[in-house]
Amino acid sequence: MSETTTIAAAGTTTQPRFAAFNAAGNAVALGAEDHVITRDTSTGLEYTAAGQRGDYLEHDPAMQACTAVAIAGGGWRAPTRAELIAITDITRHAPAIDAEAFPFVSDDWYWSSDLTAWSSSSAWGVYFNYGGVDGAHRGDDGFALAVRRAGQ
């Protein structure tokens, strides 16, 4: 079952943490066949429900793949380290992410847009097998999720 988040507005209500949308931007059930966008209702960010298809990518091509996403109007970019950490769930394993909200994310390395402080040749990422966060050489291979502010 997917997480819930308590949101205080005019009183307190409980709503699902994640919501799913199809390529046209219409709401669908989490995990539906046409679920391609996952909205984090606690942050207002939307993520692609899957990483790029196919082979692993080095950091720069992964960043380019994120900005090339054209689902539901575009406006996509690579996530920051903090944005990837925000969707990581260390109570889960292989993958360490809500698999209902992100049904096509594998338990592998996903790049962030943030470079490490110790070297511009390295960038941060999350290993969704167990939720580890680390820096890796930008020539190493990984996957990418794209992110944007909801409503773009």
Which residue stretches match the model-derived regions?
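Glycine-aromatic-enriched surface loops/turns that form tight recognition elements
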Residues: 1-77, 81-152
